[in-house]
């Protein structure tokens, strides 16, 4: 399969992951899609993420990731199907990693995979859908050597 992943760093800051790492993570999430695909990963600051989250979800605060699936008119065909955009706020990921005592790279991996899965049609609104999405995320993270982020460790319960 051929994947075209456009990376846009609108933060103006150096990121903890290279463009190659971001591309590999997005490609991993696309692997079972079994079709050529194109998507954009846009990295934004807190101000832009707050604006997007307020505009599209009516929540006036930043979030870690938003996914915007592409919907083209039926009469338009592209050589490589455009899935849409994954928008990530690195500042939010950094804060969440510290708050939850998680590896920054592991958290980036989870959030990027999560966003790409949304473009593929996965969701977590209903419990059954959430379970399927979380199992797939955990499987992909395990391939990268990361623990299942949805399992609570015993020492976290104390």
From Swiss-Prot:
SUPFAM superfamilies from the UniProt entry: Metalloproteases ('zincins'), catalytic domain (SSF55486)
Gene3D superfamilies: Metalloproteases ('zincins'), catalytic domain (3.40.390.30)
Cofactor binding remark: Binds 1 zinc ion.
Name assigned to this protein: Endoribonuclease YbeY
Subcellular location: Cytoplasm
PROSITE patterns with a match to the protein in the record: UPF0054
InterPro entries, sorted: MetalPrtase_cat_dom_sf_prd, YbeY, YbeY_CS
EC number: 3.1.-.-
UniProt keywords, alphabetically: Cytoplasm, Endonuclease, Hydrolase, Metal-binding, Nuclease, Ribosome biogenesis, rRNA processing, Zinc
Entry function: Single strand-specific metallo-endoribonuclease involved in late-stage 70S ribosome quality control and in maturation of the 3' terminus of the 16S rRNA.
GO biological process terms, semicolon-separated: rRNA processing
Cofactor: Zn(2+)
């Amino acid at each position: 399969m051929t994947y075209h992943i456009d990376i846009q760093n609108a933060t103006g800051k150096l990121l903890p992951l290279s463009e190659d790492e971001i591309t590999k993570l997005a490609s991993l999430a696309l692997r079972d899609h079994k079709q050529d695909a194109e998507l954009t990963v846009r990295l934004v600051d807190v101000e832009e993420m707050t604006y997007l989250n307020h505009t599209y979800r009516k929540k006036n605060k930043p979030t870690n990731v938003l996914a915007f699936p592409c919907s083209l008119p039926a009469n338009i065909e592209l050589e490589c199907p455009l899935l849409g955009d994954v928008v990530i706020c690195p500042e939010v990921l950094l804060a969440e990693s510290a708050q939850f005592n998680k590896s920054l790279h592991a958290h980036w991996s989870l959030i990027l995979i999560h966003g790409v899965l949304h473009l593929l049609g996965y969701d977590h609104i209903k419990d059954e859908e959430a379970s399927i999405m979380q199992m797939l995320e955990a499987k992909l993270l395990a391939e990268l050597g990361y623990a299942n982020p949805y399992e609570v460790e015993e020492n976290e319960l104390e």
